């Protein structure tokens, strides 16, 4: 999809969207303030005909980043003349309300906490280049994320569309997905967009 270059995307889906597609479901992205990840994720979804008419509800704790990402996604939708709707709120529960698909791509603690996931193991002789998913750094990251993931699950159970699917992209992906599956009481799948 053509983003913000002001050109119509060759092969845009807009011309192929007929009355058979209705804006009948909502996709919520929690942690949508990451411009690179959210833009790529939603751009990919907009290549699927069933998603070009849905509502994308973006939520993040950082209102500045959230607004930037919303503008980028709205530009993608507009340039490609798609009927998708884009909303943004810092109220996570409002964003989840009525959603069929809820995606988590949060980094609890931000980059500051991430640096401690590397520094603490290194202090004890464990040199790991990334602390996202494995080793001591991954465990530290999981301890920060799992309580938040379970809060998301509570909201999903209470206000999302019945039978909604929670798609976890947040690292440590396996730990977060396991916690949501074992203790969250929601339908959940763990995914890695970068593989």
Q: Which functions belong to the PLM regions below?
A:
Residues 47-50, 74-78, 104, 158, ...:
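Short, surface-exposed basic-aromatic patches at helix termini and helix-loop junctions that form
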């Amino acid at each position: 999809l053509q983003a913000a270059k002001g050109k119509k995307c060759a092969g845009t889906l807009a011309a192929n969207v007929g009355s058979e597609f209705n804006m009948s479901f909502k996709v919520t992205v929690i942690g949508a303030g990451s411009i690179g990840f959210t833009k790529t994720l939603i751009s990919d979804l907009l290549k699927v005909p069933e998603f070009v008419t849905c509502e994308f509800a973006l939520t993040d704790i950082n209102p500045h980043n959230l607004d930037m990402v919303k503008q980028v996604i709205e530009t993608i939708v507009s340039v490609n003349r798609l009927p998708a709707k884009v909303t943004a709120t810092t109220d996570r529960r409002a964003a989840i309300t009525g959603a069929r698909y809820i995606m988590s791509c949060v980094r609890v603690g931000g980059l500051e906490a991430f640096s401690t996931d590397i520094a603490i193991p290194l202090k004890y002789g464990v040199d790991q280049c990334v602390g996202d998913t494995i080793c001591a750094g991954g465990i530290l990251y999981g301890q920060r994320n799992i309580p938040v993931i379970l809060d998301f699950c509570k909201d999903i159970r209470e206000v999302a569309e019945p039978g909604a699917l929670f798609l976890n992209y947040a690292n440590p992906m396996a730990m977060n997905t396991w916690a949501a599956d074992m203790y969250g009481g929601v339908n959940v799948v763990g995914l890695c967009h970068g593989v």
